[in-house]
A protein has these predicted regions:
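S-adenosyl-L-methionine/SAH cofactor-binding core of RNA-modifying enzymes
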Residues: 2-59
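Conserved residues at beta->alpha junctions
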Residues: 37, 67, 94
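A short, terminal or domain-edge coil/loop segment
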Residues: 44-59, 86-93, 114-118
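Generic beta-strand structural signal
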Residues: 61-63, 81
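Rossmann-fold NAD(P)-binding glycine/threonine-rich loop
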Residues: 66, 72
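Structured adenosyl-cofactor binding patch, chiefly the S-adenosyl-L-methionine
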Residues: 73-117
Length: 118
């Protein structure tokens, strides 16, 4: 959370949040934004994306949820990929829960467990 964020314009708030996000990243991080304008993947396709990036790279995967007004342009430029969980808008709490479940599902798919059904 940004101190006194309520006093800032949407653009100023996105810029401030963006600066904090960018400061926390390493140059080697593979950044995936959770964004409603991103790629819409099936659970299997998402597991393949995870697997490809975990196997082919020493970089850390970093998933980022945007603020109330989305991401700053600088964060969009830094991102390697944008991923959509839905075209709908969800609260941060809901995104965390839905995304955690998709991560769990993806790893069970990769491990060949019977959690996911086609």
């Amino acid at each position: 959370d940004i101190k006194n964020g309520g006093k800032l314009s949407k653009k100023e708030l996105k810029e401030k949040e963006g600066n904090l996000i960018l400061k926390s990243l390493k140059n080697s991080d593979y950044v995936i934004l959770l964004d409603d304008k991103g790629l819409a993947l099936t659970s299997i396709e998402f597991s393949e994306l995870l697997n490809k990036n975990m196997v082919s790279s020493a970089n850390e995967l970093v998933f980022i949820i945007g603020g109330a007004f989305g991401f700053s342009e600088s964060v969009y430029r830094r991102a390697n990929t944008k991923l959509s969980l839905s075209k709908m808008t969800f609260s941060h709490q809901m995104v965390r829960m839905i995304f955690k479940e998709q991560l769990y599902r993806a790893f069970t798919i990769l491990e060949g467990e019977k959690y996911h059904h086609e």
